[in-house]
Amino acid sequence: MKRFLFFVVCALMLAGCATQNVDKEKDNQSTTSKKVYDSNNQKEQAISTSTGNMFEIKNGVLVRYKGGYNKALKIVLPQKVKEIASKAFILTKDEKKHVGELKVSSIEIGKDVKLHKNAFYGAGPLKVTLLDGRINVEKHSFSEMGKYGCESEIFMCESIKTIEEYAFYEENGTKKVYLNNNLERIEKSGLYGAAYSDLPDSIKYLGSNSLGYASKQITKLPENLEYIGEHCLTLYGGKIKVSSHVKKMAVNAIVWECTNSDVQGYEVDKNNLYYKSDSNGWLYSKDGKKLFYAYRLPSENNVVIPKGVEKVYKKGVYMYGDDFAPGEKSKIINS
């Protein structure tokens, strides 16, 4: 009997120890789980704090981006940002010394975020996407973005209709703009100095100096184009096609830089109601009475005005000095 009681007591003691071990293991697991949760929570908090410290914002205006360009980041604007101030993304003094080492970051700009003049002046390397719903690109907003030599890209959403004056103006040519298919207007110097994708046929208006020096060979202007401003585009040779929709062209609308190319000038669609061109690429009014563009042919010593031309616009006649012979009734217009 005593031996039986002894075994019962031992069994109870072993069961108690096992229960204590299980409880202890559960406590350890709970403690470990709590530590992991706290660690993750602290990490998330750190990221959140870091993100918050990337921007200086005053009354809804992003005054300064402080995240730097040493890492490739996806910059997410806080929802409270309604405007971007001048030079908000400009490089620091130290970053200007190490331009070649900076990383490309990306950022999306909402349709309701207003861009101030020079908002991206002197910025680091960026890929900027303008989100759908935006109607225009504001004046000077991306002007001189590559001031310090950083290369950037801007992707335009399909809703944009107008590139305003000097919006993408650039002296260094370190920026490329991807144009959308519904674009209608590029105003004065809107893309001057920037590289850009093919011109969409939707464009109706090209202001003076709007395209600047061609970053690649352009042989055709947009199909729906109606107006071309002065010095709209500068080419280095080759003819350019003008559609039947063009109604108004400034004298010197297209400029051909000094070139050894024998091929230059306009090729106007025969159905155009306002202009025509000849086999040399010279540009006339539809009735042939006005000469807007001409250059000295390789076979001639001077520019000879064809018979029937009554007005010659001197600013559009490319020659050396004044050595051209006007037609019998032509009048030289110095404008």
Predicted regions and their residues:
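Positively charged n-region of N-terminal signal peptides that target proteins for export
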Residues: M1-F4
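Structural signature of tandem-repeat unit edges
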Residues: S50-K58, G68-E83, D94-K114, G124-N136, ...
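N-terminal, intrinsically disordered, polar/charged segments of Gram-positive cell-envelope systems
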Residues: V22-S50
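Periodic small-residue-enriched repeat registers in elongated scaffold domains
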Residues: A88, A119-F120, S141-M145, A167, ...
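C-terminal motif of bacterial Sec signal peptides marking the signal peptidase cleavage site
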Residues: L14-G16
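Bacterial signal peptide processing site
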Residues: A18-Q20
